[in-house]
Each structure stands twice: as C-alpha cells, then as structure tokens.
C-alpha cells in the first residue's frame, strides 16, 4: 500500500542521469573553449597568439562537430531509457528528441569524415604540431595544480600522456600504411574528446573547489567532475586499445563476404 520509491534511488538511473549531466556540461564547456579560440584568432593583437588560436580551432573543430554529436545522441538515448516504455511513445516527446539528435551525426558531414579530417589533415598533416598546442596547454595546467586538485590533475596527466603516445604511434604507423588513418580515426577522435572533456572538468573542479560551501551549484559541479573522472574518462583505455589494434582486422573479409 505504500507509494513506490522514486526511480532516482536506483543506481542505474543515477548512472544515466550523471552521464547525461557530465557529458552535456562538459560539452558546453568545450564549446565555450573553442569559441574563445575563435575570438582569439580573430581579435588578438599578437600575431603568434592569433596563429596558435587558428591552429587550435582547426584541430578542435572536427572534435566539436563529431564528439559533441556522438555524446549528444548517447545522452538523449539515456533520457529515453530513464522514461522506460514512456520514452518510446510520442506523449512525452523524448522519441522525437532522439530523432533530432541522430541527424546531427550526419548533416555536418558524417562523423567518420570529421574523424578523418582530425587525424589525416589536422594531426598527421601538421606532423602533430596542432595537437601539441593542446596537450602542452593541458600539461601546463597540470603542472600548476595544487595538492587539492590532485584527484583531477593526476588522472588528467595520465590521460594526456596516453593521448600523446597514441598520437605518436599513429603518426609512425600511417607512414607505412595509409589505411591506418581511416581505421583509427573514429576511436582516436573519441580518445581526444574524452581527454578534452577531462581538461574542461578539471578546470571546472578548480573553480568549484575554491568556492565549495558557498553554493550547491559548486557542490554539484564537483560531484559531477568526480563522476566523470571515475566512470567516463576510463573509456579511453578500451578506445586506445582499438586504435592500436590497427587496420588488419578490417580487411579480413572480401567485399562479397559482407
């Protein structure tokens, strides 16, 4: 006869809600970061600063287009799943949101093409120089982090080291086999995206730590940052393993065997 518990008591519902929150808020921060580089590239009075910002924009644009839309669909499907059967019917509108998000992976140029642009033109095309702008900035942030930020700066340092090693591996492999570029591009873009979001969340955590106790807003940011580092950033390890698996397994079947 008692009322049922609200579904937020279920760990899996909390997992989905926190995944939505962490990816959406991380994506907003990353979008703002890219927008800041656009402004810097256009308005900075220093030529060196403008050039660096232009190269960062070139590097990060395919990540913004593809990773945000891939994660956007994931979070929208989580929202549908939380509704249960009601998420599938028209009454609540969630099924339409899924359709609306699905097209975003296609109409800016399919996300596979965005990934090819990132790896082929921006990373390999620049000899890794464009990506070093970004990874060096993250490493400078890590070096400046105090002990209180260590729970975020240490895994961020490991993530950016992994990204640099993966980039070097791909630069080397692509010299002998151009198929490696296409085989690795989507997973590489996702490794890049998760690492970029980790940087955004570390920046937000630094602000939240300085203001904790002032407002629930900052407590929420800090808790979400901890969730991101604990549950989402580790995805880079399986993705990196897929990149390093190479292109061979993609060519084991003839076209007629598909």
How would you label these PLM feature ranges?
Residues 23-29, 37-51, 74, 78-90, ...:
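Secondary-structure transition/capping motifs at alpha-helix termini
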Residues 125, 141-258:
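C-terminal amphipathic alpha-helical interaction region
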Residues 135-141:
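Short, charge-rich amphipathic alpha-helices with coiled-coil/heptad character
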Residues 33, 55-133, 223, 227-253:
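Alpha-helix capping/hinge segments and adjacent helical runs
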Residues 1-16, 22:
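Terminal amphipathic helices with adjacent charged low-complexity linkers/tails
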Residues 36, 77, 120-121, 200-206:
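Short glycine/serine- and small hydrophobic-enriched flexible loop segments
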Residues 25-64, 168-183, 204-219:
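C-terminal helix-coil-helix/basic helical segment that borders enzyme active sites and/or dimer interfaces
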């Amino acid at each position: 006869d008692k009322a049922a518990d609200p579904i937020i008591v279920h760990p899996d519902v909390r997992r989905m809600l926190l995944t939505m929150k962490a990816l959406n808020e991380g994506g907003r921060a990353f979008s703002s970061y890219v927008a800041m580089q656009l402004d810097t590239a256009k308005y900075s009075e220093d030529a060196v600063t403008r050039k660096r910002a232009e190269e960062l924009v070139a590097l990060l644009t395919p990540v913004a287009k593809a990773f945000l839309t891939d994660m956007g669909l994931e979070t929208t499907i989580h929202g549908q799943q939380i509704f249960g059967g009601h998420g599938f019917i028209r009454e609540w509108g969630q099924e339409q949101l899924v359709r609306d998000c699905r097209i975003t992976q296609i109409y800016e140029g399919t996300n596979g093409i965005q990934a090819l642009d990132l790896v082929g033109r921006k990373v390999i095309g620049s000899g890794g120089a464009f990506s070093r702008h970004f990874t060096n900035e993250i490493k400078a942030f890590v070096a400046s982090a105090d002990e209180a930020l260590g729970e975020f700066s240490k895994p961020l340092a490991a993530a950016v080291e992994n990204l640099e090693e993966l980039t070097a591996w791909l630069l080397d492999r692509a010299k002998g086999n151009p198929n490696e570029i296409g085989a690795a591009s989507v997973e590489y873009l996702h490794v890049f995206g998760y690492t970029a979001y980790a940087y955004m969340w570390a920046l937000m955590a630094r602000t939240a730590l300085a203001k904790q106790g002032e407002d629930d807003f900052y407590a929420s940011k800090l808790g979400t940052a901890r969730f991101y580092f604990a549950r989402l950033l580790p995805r880079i390890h399986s993705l990196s393993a897929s990149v390093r698996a190479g292109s061979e397994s993609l060519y084991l079947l003839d076209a007629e065997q598909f």
